[in-house]
A protein has these predicted regions:
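Active-site histidine-anchored catalytic micro-motif
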Residues: 155
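Conserved "HGTGT" condensation-loop signature of ketosynthase/thiolase-family condensing enzymes
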Residues: 1-150, 162-168, 177-181, 189-320
Length: 320
C-alpha cells in the first residue's frame, strides 16, 4: 500500500470501423486450421474483429487481414495527445521537465511481419519503440518495450511502481496497443483452451477481438485513481487469501470466471471485461478503469485480475 502510485491521466481509443466476421480461406490453410481449433477451444461458432485501418476496397475474406497499419500508428499519437492534454497545465509542464520514463507495450513483440505492405520506416515503430511518442513527452531518460503478451501492461505497471517508489523517476508513461491479428489471436487462445462446459456470453457463439490503444501517466502525485500492483500467485489459493481485503467491492477479470472463483471465499461482484467490452489483449485490464469512469463510481476499491495459463494470477488494486 505504501508503494501505491497514482494514475494521473489515461486515454483509450478503439476503431470507429464496424465489426467484421472472420471467414477462413483456403489461401491460408494454417490460419484456417487455427481458427477451427480456436472455435472448439472456446465453444463458439464465429469470430468478429474490429481493427484500425480496415480497407473498403479489400476483398471480403481479407478485410480483417489487409488493414492499413498507419491508422494504428495514428491512434497511438492521438491517445498520447489526449492523455497529455488531460493533465493540468502545471502537471504537464512538470512532466516535460522532470525525470520521466517511457514504457511501450504490446501483445505480440514482433508482429510487423503480419502487417500488409509495411514500410521499413514504420516497422520499428510497431516492433521496437515509437520514437515520435518519446519526443512528444520529451523523454531523455529510460525508454523500453515490454513484450509480455496479455501480461504486458501489468508488467509495465509493476515496473512503473518500482521506479516511482524507489524515487528513480517522477513520472512514468506507459503507452501501447493491441493489434488483433487473426492468426495470433487464434493461436493465443489455443495455448489455454477453455473447459468443455460452455459459459454464457453476451453475444452467444461469438468471440470479439477489438483493437485498442492506450496511454497512461503514473506518478506519486495525488490523482483521481490510486493503483497498487500485487504479487504473482500460483495455483495455491491459500496464498491469495492472505492478500484479500474486505473493502474490495468489485473484481474485474480477463479470462474464465471459473479460473478465479477458487480464490474467493466470500461472495463478490464480478465483471468479465472480455464479455462486456471484447478482448483487447494486453490492454484489456485497463478497461476496468474505463468501467469506473463510465459509471462515475466514487469511494471504492476494485481488484483487476489476470489469470495465467498455469492456474496462477496477477492483479492490481484501484482506489477511486
Amino acid at each position: 500500500m505504501d508503494d501505491a502510485m497514482h494514475l494521473l491521466s489515461l486515454s483509450l481509443m478503439e476503431p470507429e470501423a464496424p465489426l467484421f466476421l472472420y471467414s477462413p480461406s483456403w489461401l491460408n490453410v494454417w490460419e484456417a486450421h487455427s481458427y477451427d481449433i480456436a472455435l472448439k477451444n472456446t465453444d463458439t461458432n464465429s469470430w468478429a474483429f474490429k481493427r484500425f485501418g480496415t480497407r473498403a476496397d479489400a476483398y471480403d475474406k481479407e478485410v480483417v487481414n489487409r488493414t492499413n497499419y498507419m491508422a494504428y500508428i495514428s491512434a497511438l499519437e492521438k491517445v498520447s495527445d489526449v492523455a497529455m492534454q488531460a493533465l493540468p497545465q502545471k502537471e504537464r509542464m512538470l512532466l516535460m521537465k522532470s525525470r520521466t520514463a517511457f514504457i511501450y507495450v504490446d501483445s505480440w513483440g514482433e508482429a510487423a511481419g503480419f502487417e500488409y505492405d509495411i514500410s521499413t520506416l514504420h516497422l520499428s515503430t510497431i516492433d521496437t519503440l515509437p520514437k515520435n511518442l518519446v519526443k512528444k513527452f520529451s523523454v531523455d531518460n529510460v525508454t523500453c518495450k515490454i513484450r509480455g503478451e496479455k501480461n504486458a501492461l501489468i508488467q509495465a505497471m509493476r515496473l512503473a511502481q518500482d521506479y516511482l517508489s524507489w524515487d528513480i523517476f517522477d513520472f512514468v508513461i506507459v503507452c501501447g496497443g493491441y493489434r488483433a491479428i487473426p492468426l495470433l489471436a487464434f493461436t493465443a487462445t489455443n495455448i489455454n483452451p477453455r473447459s468443455k462446459m460452455k459459459e454464457s456470453r453476451k453475444i452467444p457463439g461469438m468471440n470479439l477481438s477489438i483493437e485498442r490503444v492506450g496511454c497512461f501517466i503514473f506518478s506519486q502525485t495525488t490523482g483521481d485513481l490510486k493503483v497498487n500492483c500485487g504479487p504473482y500467485f500460483s495455483a495455491d489459493s491459500s496464498q491469495y487469501q492472505k492478500n484479500y481485503a474486505s473493502d474490495i467491492v468489485l473484481v474485474a477479470f480477463s479470462g474464465r470466471a471459473s479460473s478465479i472463483t477458487p480464490f474467493f471465499k466470500h461472495p463478490v461482484k464480478l465483471l468479465d471485461l472480455e464479455k462486456k467490452y471484447g478482448s483487447s489483449g494486453c490492454i484489456t485490464p485497463a478497461l476496468s478503469w474505463h468501467h469506473i469512469f463510465q459509471h462515475a463510481f466514487k469511494g471504492g476499491r476494485m481488484r483487476t485480475i489476470l489469470p495465467d495459463h498455469n492456474g496462477g494470477l496477477t492483479y492490481f488494486d484501484t482506489w477511486y
